[in-house]
Amino acid sequence: MARKTAVLVTGANGEMGHGLIHRLAELGSFDVLGLDIRSIDAEVAQRCAATWVGDILDRRLIDRLMSEFEISAVFHLAAVLSTRAEFVPEAAHEVNVQGTLNLLHLAVEETRSLGRAVKFLFPSSIAAYGLPDLATKRAAGRVTEHEWLMPVTMYGGNKLSCEHLGRYFARHYRQLAPQTDAGGIDFRAIRFPGLISAFTVPSGGTSDYASEMIHAAAQGRPYACFVREDTRIPFMTMPDAIQALLTLMEAPPERLTSVVYNVSAFSPTAGDLARRVQRAFPGVAISFAPDPRRQAILDSWPEDVDVSRARADWGFTPTHDLDRAFDEYLLPNVRRRYGAR
């Protein structure tokens, strides 16, 4: 029986998965196979050619996917995220690293079967960085892809490990094997900054104070921010993040000089965000009550990242700067969601 051609999206029921699947469906060029450990929301499932519920650690599941589908590209979004990973670090490592290894193996097998390199799109994270102290962070300025890679969290370490695994599978896979048996995938990773969404209620992620602040204000609730007012890290909106993945996917391989790229759109302090929120929702109470442990993690992340390589290689250009993020995306949508004025 002929296999059905599909683009695989793992973590399909997450926020980025939802947005990516909608965009892939709009493009009309792809049949999407959605995979998640939970049942995929009906609205998203309707946009997929097929949906599967299962665990990326289940090698039998991976084998079944390969037996039924010809997978032309992989968007591997499934992960245990940063805050949760600190509570269950061993389990996070299993999912984030071994799960990724299972998907890389799938991509290698499909590369052999199809006779061409299967694209593997991987969302990495600013958590891959680790600056030793606040003074160094402030002096470092915009950090390139190859600096300060000493993460202090399990999630960051997992993401950095997977970047290296992807580079190996792309450039050095089975390098001592006979040439006819060797073959590399087309691995492409984006190191995302903090992501801000108008549509999903924040889930306690390390950079979620930005989204939490906006969603609380739109509901008229006071918000105690868990970081210092002067805390600065880079951010971008979720639509810009999804567009970055799609743009990188379409980039000609000969244009790419790296397997890992920084992206970012704006780099406000927590105080800048609070003032912007209070301008939109006058009278809302925003205070600062830093959590020392989460603050220490954020202080290890750069104030900004150098995106020049992404701009030069594949034309990365975010739509939303800080003002446009608020005026065109965040405020209209959170007001609609909560009935705020």
Model feature map: region roles:
Residues 101-154:
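Conserved Rossmann-fold NAD(P)-dependent oxidoreductase catalytic core, especially the SDR/UDP-sugar
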Residues 85-86, 146-150, 191-204, 212-236:
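A conserved pocket-lining segment of Rossmann-fold NAD(P)-dependent short-chain dehydrogenase/reductase
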Residues 7-27:
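N-terminal Rossmann NAD(P)H-binding glycine-rich loop of SDR-like oxidoreductase domains
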Residues 46-58:
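Rossmann-fold cofactor-recognition segment
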